[in-house]
């Protein structure tokens, strides 16, 4: 630890250590101020510091003022105090010399060493006055000093910025002397385990708290130093322990990767130096100046924890250090967490994507069949798996609904032909077209078979519709409240006839051509049967039900055309009944999918043909 003290002291005196201290103090000060422990430390420091209280007050003003002169003066006074100290004077004076050079070199380093010196001065002076008594108190303060010096380093970082520079220098200077003195005091404490150990415990507790407040690196290093320092100080002879402890602390500081490592080393030195009660007191007071110092200074002196408490406090210190490390990691973790949040944001982005996917799924659910067939965009928006699953489930639901509607619509003779045509045409469009045609004249009979066939055809379309959904990119433009049901027919048509929007264009453009191909509704039904090209066939069938009007309207929207022709047709009432059934069922589904529901409702309100309604219902069920 001697090497540590020596090494640590020069670094403390050196600017780099001061810089490190600065960083550490910034971090430490925040934590210290944030922590509940500062008040405890302050109380202990105030009570235990008694003798060093006056010096502490001066140190506070100096540190608070952030005057390098005050730091130098405190260093000189500490040196004088070191001279007063028995054998500690030499190390503390040497430290003072180092501190003086450091203070001259860097104000920040000066503040750091001044803190160390301040810690050392009371130690030296008090050691001269009452070596053993203060040894107990010093050990309190010594442990306190270790932690408080750690605190000083933390505050010194702040003080370096503001006023800590003056106090840092003495602490760095005092390190060796304070270590020796603190070790001596600890040994002296051994006779006075109760008072000294409690003080040490108080120091340990304070230091641990301070360490918690301090940078994680400093805290982690200091805790081992505080725990090891206390144990080592009390266990090892004063001459050996200060060096060994300093080396160990130095090693710990070296181990610390943080820029505060030098600070930690200096803080450790200061902490070791701070083993002497005086050392601890001034640092605590500067902390009070920072707002942490006041709490830290009174606590160690005022509260004399039993020796057992010192052990417990050491444990607490380590726990605190661990927590501080976690906090620092949290700071890093804060970043990491922020990154995670960003990732979460990204994940939420992913989630959002999935949510849009879900929303899109909602849309696909709205149009799962329609979307897959109608708009590849929607299908693209919705996960393929979801679409497939929903499509299959909805197809099953649709098949049941269609069967129910078919049972209501009744009649399957003409529909028997339709199943073939629907199967050939993939049934849904043929079924819907036939339904429209049948509603024109075959409404109920084809509806039953058409529903079954539509279910079959749609089931086929589910499989085919998904690949067709790629074509749905063109369809993505088509989706509209009115176009939804038509799109569902067209969806089916697209999967059947073509994989591209061309089929839809054909549906819009070619439907006029198709109607001549299937003038009779039955012929139209046969057309879908014979013709796999559903867009044209479907359009023809849709047109056929309302023959003339649909032909003109088809280009506008098959759904509307189908619905208008159906409404115009005598089967409008049937379509309305079917539509109402579909509406009830689809509305059940609509509850889940407002858009699809709205579209379906619009279709039903417009009196879309039973086929259109069924198509919408199937689409809605598929969507749902």
From Swiss-Prot:
Major localization listed first in the record, in broad terms: membrane
Gly residues bias (residue ranges): 406-416
Any one cellular-component term (Gene Ontology): plasma membrane
Signal peptide: none
Stated role: Negative regulator of the canonical Wnt signaling pathway involved in neuroectodermal patterning. Acts by specifically binding phosphatidylinositol 4,5-bisphosphate (PtdIns(4,5)P2), translocating to the cell membrane and interacting with key regulators of the canonical Wnt signaling pathway, such as components of the beta-catenin destruction complex.
Subcellular localization: Cell membrane
Compositional bias segments (type: Polar residues): 535-549
PANTHER family: APC MEMBRANE RECRUITMENT PROTEIN 2, APC MEMBRANE RECRUITMENT PROTEIN 2-RELATED
GO molecular function per UniProt: beta-catenin binding; phosphatidylinositol-4,5-bisphosphate binding
Residue stretches of biased makeup (Basic and acidic residues): 74-91, 120-132, 247-258, 450-464
Membrane topology: Peripheral membrane protein
Region Disordered, annotated ranges: 1-308, 342-596
InterPro entries: AMER
Keywords for the protein's UniProt record, in alphabetical order: Cell membrane, Lipid-binding, Membrane, Wnt signaling pathway
GO BP term (any one): regulation of canonical Wnt signaling pathway
This protein's name: APC membrane recruitment protein 2
Sequence ranges of Low complexity compositional bias: 101-111, 272-282, 295-307
Protein family: Belongs to the Amer family.
């Amino acid at each position: 630890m001697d090497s540590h003290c020596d090494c640590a002291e020069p670094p403390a005196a050196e600017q780099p250590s001061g810089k490190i201290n600065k960083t550490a103090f910034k971090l430490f000060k925040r934590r210290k101020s944030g922590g509940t422990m500062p008040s405890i430390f302050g109380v202990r420091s105030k009570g235990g510091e008694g003798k060093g209280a006056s010096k502490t007050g001066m140190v506070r003003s100096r540190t608070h003022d952030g005057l390098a002169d005050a730091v130098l003066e405190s260093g000189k006074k500490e040196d004088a105090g070191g001279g007063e100290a028995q054998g500690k004077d030499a190390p503390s004076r040497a430290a003072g010399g180092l501190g003086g050079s450091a203070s001259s070199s860097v104000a920040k380093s000066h503040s750091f060493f001044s803190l160390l010196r301040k810690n050392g001065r009371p130690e030296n002076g008090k050691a001269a006055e009452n070596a053993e008594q203060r040894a107990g108190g010093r050990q309190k303060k010594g442990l306190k000093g270790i932690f408080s010096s750690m605190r000083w380093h933390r505050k010194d970082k702040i003080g370096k910025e503001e006023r800590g520079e003056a106090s840092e220098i003495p602490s760095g200077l005092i390190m060796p002397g304070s270590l020796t003195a603190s070790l001596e005091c600890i040994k002296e404490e051994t006779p006075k385990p109760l008072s000294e150990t409690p003080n040490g415990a108080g120091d340990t507790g304070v230091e641990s708290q301070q360490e918690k407040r301090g940078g994680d690196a400093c805290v982690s290093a200091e805790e081992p130093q505080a725990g090891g320092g206390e144990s080592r100080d009390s266990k090892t002879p004063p001459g050996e322990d200060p060096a060994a402890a300093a080396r160990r602390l130095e090693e710990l500081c070296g181990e610390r990767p943080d820029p505060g490592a030098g600070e930690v080393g200096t803080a450790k030195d200061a902490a070791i130096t701070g083993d002497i009660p005086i050392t601890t007191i001034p640092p605590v007071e500067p902390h009070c100046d920072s707002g942490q110092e006041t709490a830290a200074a009174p606590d160690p002196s005022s509260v004399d924890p039993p020796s057992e408490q010192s052990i417990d406090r050491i444990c607490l210190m380590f726990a605190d250090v661990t927590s501080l490390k976690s906090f620092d990691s949290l700071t890093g973790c804060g970043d990491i967490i922020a990154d995670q949040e960003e990732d979460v944001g990204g994940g939420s982005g992913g989630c959002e994507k999935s949510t849009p996917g879900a929303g899109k799924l909602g849309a696909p659910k709205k149009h799962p069949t329609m979307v897959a067939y109608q708009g590849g965009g929607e299908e693209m928006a919705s996960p393929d798996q979801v679409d497939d699953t929903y499509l299959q489930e909805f197809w099953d639901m649709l098949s049941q609904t269609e069967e129910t509607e078919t049972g209501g619509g009744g009649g399957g003779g003409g529909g028997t032909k339709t199943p073939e045509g629907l199967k050939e045409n993939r049934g849904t469009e043929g079924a819907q077209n036939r339904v429209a045609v049948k509603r024109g004249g075959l409404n109920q009979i084809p509806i039953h078979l058409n529903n079954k066939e539509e279910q079959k055809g749609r089931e086929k379309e589910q499989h085919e519709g998904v690949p067709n959904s790629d074509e749905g990119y063109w369809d993505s433009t088509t989706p509209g409240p009115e176009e939804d049901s038509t799109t569902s027919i067209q969806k089916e048509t697209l999967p059947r006839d073509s994989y591209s929007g061309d089929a839809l264009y054909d549906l819009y453009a070619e439907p006029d051509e198709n109607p001549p191909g299937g003038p009779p509704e039955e012929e139209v039904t046969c057309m879908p049967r014979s013709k796999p090209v559903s867009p044209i066939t479907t359009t023809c069938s849709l047109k056929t039900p309302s023959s003339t009007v649909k032909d003109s309207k088809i280009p506008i929207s098959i759904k509307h055309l189908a619905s208008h022709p159906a409404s115009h047709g005598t089967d409008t009432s049937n379509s309305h009944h079917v539509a109402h059934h579909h509406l009830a069922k689809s509305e059940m589904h609509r509850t889940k999918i407002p858009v699809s529901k709205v579209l379906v409702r619009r279709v039903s309100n417009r009196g879309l043909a039973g086929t259109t309604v069924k198509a919408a219902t199937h689409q809605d069920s598929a969507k749902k």
